[in-house]
Regions:
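Active-site bordering "gate/hinge" segments
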Residues: 1-252
Length: 252
């Protein structure tokens, strides 16, 4: 069997100067990617000292999925499940951005009820994605209890989304002009009741993980992103607001 040599230009070699500086400063060079155990492929080379990242060299391009090219030969409606895969943990908001672009281009007016229902769907999807991220963050800390709390919260929301669309992921429920179908009052009542249970579980998660002294000791002052850098890097969502920028695209 003849061994297959990997392409030499698969990724850029680590700079010798980068390694030398790390050794002189008693730091460790940690190359990550382009393949790793997570769901997204990336290539970053870090210089770390303890839990602190001193420097990093990112190499972008490993998660490019050619969405624009794939969409060229499809109908508008066929692209809905395609663009949901940009962030499969938050498909409703990926879909909403695409559908609104179509509506704005064609001058389509969306009924008021559909706008409200879209907002409910998008918020549920956003919270579900947030607690997935928070759960993985807890797991990285070795806090399995926090991880299980997040997954329990996420499962409640996924069950509600399944009641709406019939799908646990990739619902393709938001379409140009409104929704694929109406949401019944029974399901809306279920969501209303669920919010109270969610609030209690969220408060519990805050007490066992967010306000945990170990979490604070390990996370405080690590990876600080200033307001100026957040704006310069084009950050959005909770990352932007956590840096002190009072901006929420949902209110624009």
């Amino acid at each position: 069997m003849i061994p297959i040599e990997p392409p030499k230009d698969l990724y850029t070699p680590i700079w010798e100067e980068f390694i030398e500086v790390a050794h002189e400063s008693d730091e460790i060079v940690v190359p990550i990617g382009p393949h790793h155990a997570g769901s997204g492929h990336l290539r970053v080379t870090f210089r770390v000292k303890g839990d602190r990242i001193v420097d990093a060299i990112p190499e972008p391009g490993f998660v490019h999925r050619s969405m624009e090219k794939l969409a060229e030969n499809k109908l508008y409606i066929q692209n809905i499940p395609l663009f949901e895969r940009l962030a499969i943990n938050d498909p409703a908001n990926m879909n909403l951005a695409y559908v609104r672009a179509i509506e704005n281009a064609l001058g389509v007016e969306v009924p008021e009820r559909a706008q409200y229902l879209r907002t409910i769907l998008a918020e549920l999807s956003r919270i579900e994605a947030f607690y997935y991220d928070a759960g993985i963050f807890s797991l990285f800390f070795g806090h399995t209890t926090g991880f299980m709390y997040c997954m329990a919260i996420r499962e409640m929301i996924i069950e509600a989304l399944m009641q709406i669309s019939g799908s646990r992921s990739g619902p393709s429920f938001i379409v140009p002009g409104g929704l694929r179908r109406d949401i019944s009052d029974d399901v809306l009542g279920l969501i209303d009741n669920m919010t109270f249970a969610l609030h209690k579980r969220m408060k519990k998660f805050e007490s066992i993980f967010v306000n945990n002294p170990v979490t604070i000791a390990r996370a405080k002052g690590v990876g600080v992103l200033t307001k100026e850098d957040a704006i310069r890097c084009g950050m959005v969502g909770p990352f932007l607001r956590a840096s002190g920028v009072n901006y929420d695209v949902r209110k624009v």
